[in-house]
């Protein structure tokens, strides 16, 4: 099963840290995402504290009210290698693909070692787009395994994107997403028109939208502009305490996205202007001059 099938937009459900440290909730999220029509599950893999900008600062855990170091907080949100393996098995058993944003070289190794036969895709998060050594390594791993490397462009200018693309090994299957690193993102900051620009600059890449908004409409618009994959932050309940719930879609929202983008893809056609058989009876009745 390919990550992308022509004519169907690939929807990736990003679990982020919305399980609030609960592996049981993670399992529920994977099952709910599959039921809602997602094609893939994505998680985050970090090596704590190596991949943290400031691990020593204090953090109040939103769902417990307990104060701890930032490193302790991030560790609470991380999956163990066994949990990564179990989530991958569950995801694949439900007919979806499994991958992760890897925040460092050690995280890449952790993911590859933990998951049977390795992940189905890698992703470079927006914050990693200037880490060209990491992106190059992920592209080599992706090329070697025959899987995609996804690039997210939040907080990037075109030069940053070009640097990341050029750092990838030739022949790697690259997927590039328009993204705005704002959580949740206001519609006027989504800039989905950039999808046109990306398609023009990178005609050989699969262009998509890494979405942090909470409306279905811009996602459908992005598909109309040529996006063929969409990443959504996913939660079981947007009212839960935590860092990403407010910028996430619940199962009902993902179900709407699936329905609406499928409808849009059917409506787009192939660009050929034609007379459909269903129009014949109408024209026979209304057209006065043949």
Residue ranges and their predicted role:
Residues 1-290:
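Catalytic cores and adjacent flexible loops of soluble metabolic enzymes
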